[in-house]
């Protein structure tokens, strides 16, 4: 079963706990720029991209606004050698920074990329939007070269029972999203064990799977950016604090 029935989970964080965490005093240890740089160095999605082999060809599936392309140049090490191809349901302005792109509705017609084979796949916050998450594993098995690696990220079960965004905002914690169903385009939450089985059926070995947590950096981000106009660092700290996202890294045999 790809979507498990609801069952007891680790206790999620409630409104009072989140508000107390958000408002507690903090003293930064880094300057603001360095805190952002370090966050985007240690985030598993970016570190995966940065450590790919020289001249790797990368499929960015569910590329959104195309911001993954920014990480070729920042932070260090620069990776202008990466050959990146974007896929989404519609074109974003940053898609022109890629070597190529394709747009379609995955549920009707996944991308073909003119028959290209890839050294790596990055798929972040996409499988919770499609009808059959296992179809990504099948696509990766067909389009990644032997030894090619896949990074897949999506919300964790801990996101399901968080307070709604509107409740946290009323309590003084402004966010873009809190609970999984704050985003009405989300379908049901794909189960990690089922995704691992789908990858194995399609010829992949699992390297690592887990929850994304960066506790020290979430404190740095809030020390600098809790009340900033740019809400992304605040949101990133919340995602880390709540264990909002999970990921898998797998290698095609």
Predicted regions and their residues:
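Short catalytic micro-motifs in class I SAM-dependent methyltransferases
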Residues: 125-129
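Conserved N-terminal segment of class I S-adenosyl-L-methionine
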Residues: 1-116, 120-124, 137, 210-214, ...
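Short loop segments at secondary-structure junctions
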Residues: 252-253
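Short conserved AdoMet
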Residues: 53, 131, 145
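S-adenosyl-L-methionine-dependent methyltransferase catalytic module, highlighting the catalytic core
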Residues: 6-10, 14-17, 21-25, 131-140, ...
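Residue-level signal for threonine
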Residues: 92, 145, 158
């Amino acid at each position: 079963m790809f979507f498990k029935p609801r069952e007891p989970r680790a206790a999620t964080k409630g409104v009072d706990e989140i508000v107390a965490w958000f408002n507690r005093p903090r003293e930064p240890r880094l300057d603001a720029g360095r805190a952002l740089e370090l966050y985007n160095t240690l985030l598993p999605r970016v570190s995966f991209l940065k450590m790919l082999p020289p001249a790797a060809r990368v499929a960015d599936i569910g590329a959104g606004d195309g911001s993954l392309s920014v990480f070729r140049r920042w932070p260090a090490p620069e990776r202008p050698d990466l050959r990146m191809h974007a896929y989404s349901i519609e074109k974003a302005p940053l898609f022109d920074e890629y070597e190529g792109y394709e747009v379609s509705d995955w549920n009707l017609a996944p991308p073909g990329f003119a028959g290209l084979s890839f050294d790596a796949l990055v798929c972040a916050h996409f499988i919770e939007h499609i009808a059959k998450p296992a179809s990504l594993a099948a696509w990766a098995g067909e389009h990644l070269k032997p030894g090619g690696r896949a990074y897949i990220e999506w919300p964790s079960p801990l996101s399901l029972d968080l307070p709604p965004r509107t409740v946290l905002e009323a309590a003084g914690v402004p966010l873009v999203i809190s609970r999984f169903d704050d985003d009405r385009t989300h379908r049901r939450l794909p189960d990690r064990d089922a995704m691992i089985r789908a990858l194995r059926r399609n010829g992949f070995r699992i390297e690592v799977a887990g929850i994304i947590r960066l506790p020290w950096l979430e404190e740095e981000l809030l020390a600098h950016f809790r009340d900033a106009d740019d809400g992304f660092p605040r949101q990133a700290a919340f995602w880390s604090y709540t264990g909002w996202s999970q990921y898998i890294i797998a290698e095609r045999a």
